[in-house]
Amino acid sequence: MKCARLNDRIIHLHTYSREHYQFLFEEGIKGHLFCSHCGKPVLLRLNIADPPEFIHRQPGDFPACEEACEPKPSKEGKKEDDQESGVIRLPKGKAIAADPSPAVTEWHRPRSIKPGTPFVPKTIEPDTSLFPSVGLNTDQLKAVTETEGPLLVLAGAGSGKTRVLTARAAHMIEHLGIPPENMLLVTFTTKAVAEMKERMANQYGLQPAKVRRIVTGTFHSLFYKILYHSNSAKWNGEHLLKMEWQREQYIKKALYEEGIDEKESPVDQALQQIGFWKNTYVPNERIPLKDEWEKQVYRLYEHYERQKKEHSQFDFDDMASACYELFIERPDLLEQYQSRFTYILIDEFQDINPVQYKIMQMLASPEQNLCCVGDDDQSIYAFRGSNPSFILDFQKDYPGAKTIYLTANYRSTHPIVSSADIVVKKNKNRYAKTLEAARDDIQVPVLFYPYDEEEEATMVVSDIKEKIQNGASPEDFAVLYRTNSGGRAIYERLHQSSIPYTADRGVQSFYSRRIVRQILAYLYASQNEDDTEAIKHLLPALFLKQSALNTLKALSITEDCTMIKALAKLPDLKPFQLDKIKKIVPFFASLRTMKPVEAITFAEGKMGFSEYLKKRGNEGNKLEKGSDDLRDIKVVAKKFKTIPDFLAHVDHMRAAEKNRTDEHGVQLMTIHRSKGLEFKTVYVLGTVDGSIPHDFSLETARKGDEAALEEERRLLYVAMTRAKQHLYLSCPANRRGKTANRSRFLYPLLQKARQPLHH
């Protein structure tokens, strides 16, 4: 049905602003929508495959209702002196001034993506000559048996990389008689290490004692062991800053010593930048400082290093550089390890950073039995110092090296693999190769077009619900997004549903972000001018130190006024500060009755919050900017009519952040976190320019550097190849309150698109 009754008014979808469909959806959930013919409760159906329509809450056939709701030409035109805004009728010339609505957008039927090439089934039987229980294809067998000299194995997504690594190690031990203790197998996660050991014991029949003798571990664990054996007092594990909060404490102390309010500097980003400098192994005096943010972080870096030295402590990044320096200073020690590790296997080679690679090269000499397994198309960790150039230049570093391509994908269907391949082939800096699926399927990737982030989340959850009702398990699904803020709406929608889910901590903490807390503080303070927590978050935006909080508490008592009004009575304020605060204080009462999005816009402009954001300058976080958070919170605020209702929602979601316990169900995660995982059904959110690819990569590309843009394309490739059977790519028409353009990475797919998908 295309019509329903809301608040004694008939709603016709064909004349109703698409912007407000999400509002109608939520009104239906609350029981406020009714059939305009029979009067029974109805819902607005918003899903991926079908046009939006009203459906009765109770299942059944309602032909009379459907017939009554067929659109009829209106005999009376709309009154000229009125215009509509959602369900509110406004006098002509008047509008809600807070945030102009984007243009009405028609619903577009989703499109299916045609495979770039026809599926060609492979009839080659797997080879079981090495291990009867483990079949290997021709290329895998080559990678397993090519044991001498430098070898690069380019293992495409889902091509059996772990099988090759474990089979190779088992073959060398069982069939070639190589002592396990002479083998070094290095990867990036303890989970991968455990999985490889388990496979070697269970699938290949290696004796547990032999498996234990293989030196396996992460880069960090390997470097720690080497350092500990060289100087156990200095490199004792008790001196390691294992936890993130320990490192953050030193940065916070450094901020204090520099006279910087810790609420004004993203500690996590400072630590990430410091880690990047360490992992690229640039001497301190030669670190290029590009802007004021990096200059500030460099000063924090110096404080951080000094504090660690004073306490004889070290962090994970220190171990790599220290190990490298140890081998430079102690060639005799390096020679001992070279004699010990005559065969080296490196997993996820595309993620290696400069220091790690230098150490592995040193250990591999002079035998050069170095086997590196990776995929240049999955290099997505530039922010950690990794660089695809190491895998791309392997032949230059080792001119006699052999290269083996693993291009058979056993995870995903042909339509998914073909689509992902079309996307990544637009990159220039990569090995020329074509990934091929081992199986076909009639299900093809789907592009769908929600109005905005809110409708996007509703459509995805509706689709998941429908699939679960048809027998799917919640664990079959993953929802992927570029940055944590991109998962905010889907997190909220799943929280409101009965579907079990698990989410990254980052997406759960949206309402705890610094900028979000600060802008919301204006709204909280408007409702309660003695809200200490809100005022604490307001102070930085008013360019006041946290020490002012206690003064405000005292003044509110001695002057018999609210803490907000006490702001204008603070002593020792500079004249410009006093003038500004006197101007702002009365505005809190004005905010009280505004709509939430109006209040946020008012605080931005009239109360100076946008000016504060500009003065803060570069936050150091290229991916999650404060201004982006501000746009995100306005998208949420639009859904609520009153500030108390909006803040109740915020409080509810903050409580949910603290109380989440589910470990199973639909997986919500960033694309980075999804790497190495696989799911039957994958939804990729926000495939629009500015999200995937991210704004910062578009900016650098405009300046002539396309490295970041190519990494963004690899990121989409990684997201697409997580899907085993169903892949959905979302292209919202609006993002963060502005019109969005579908991702430029999708253009090659759209050229291959079939006719619109029919449900």
Swiss-Prot record:
What's its catalytic activity? Couples ATP hydrolysis with the unwinding of duplex DNA by translocating in the 3'-5' direction; ATP + H2O = ADP + phosphate + H(+)
Which CDD domains does the protein's record reference?
DEXQc_UvrD (cd17932), SF1_C_UvrD (cd18807)
Domain of life, source organism: Bacteria
Q: Which Pfam families match?
A: UvrD-helicase, UvrD_C
List, for all copies, the residue spans of the domain called UvrD-like helicase ATP-binding.
Answer: 134-413
Q: Which GO terms describe its biological process?
A: recombinational repair
User: Start and end of every UvrD-like helicase C-terminal domain?
Assistant: 414-676
- Give me the stretches of Basic and acidic residues compositional bias: 69-81
Q: Which InterPro entries match?
A: DExx_box_DNA_helicase_dom_sf (IPR013986), DNA_helicase_UvrD-like_C (IPR014017), DNA_helicase_UvrD/REP (IPR000212), P-loop_NTPase (IPR027417), UvrD-like_ATP-bd (IPR014016)
Q: What class of enzyme is it?
A: isomerase
Enzyme Commission designation: 5.6.2.4
| Binding of ATP, residues | G158, S159, G160, K161, T162, R163, R411
- Key words, A-Z: ATP-binding, Cytoplasm, DNA-binding, Helicase, Hydrolase, Isomerase, Nucleotide-binding
Q: Tell me the segments the record calls region Disordered.
A: 68-121
Assigned GO CC terms: cytosol; DNA helicase complex
Cross-referenced PROSITE patterns, in alphabetical order? UVRD_HELICASE_ATP_BIND, UVRD_HELICASE_CTER
Similarity comment: family membership: Belongs to the helicase family. UvrD subfamily.
- The name this protein goes by in its record: Putative ATP-dependent DNA helicase YjcD
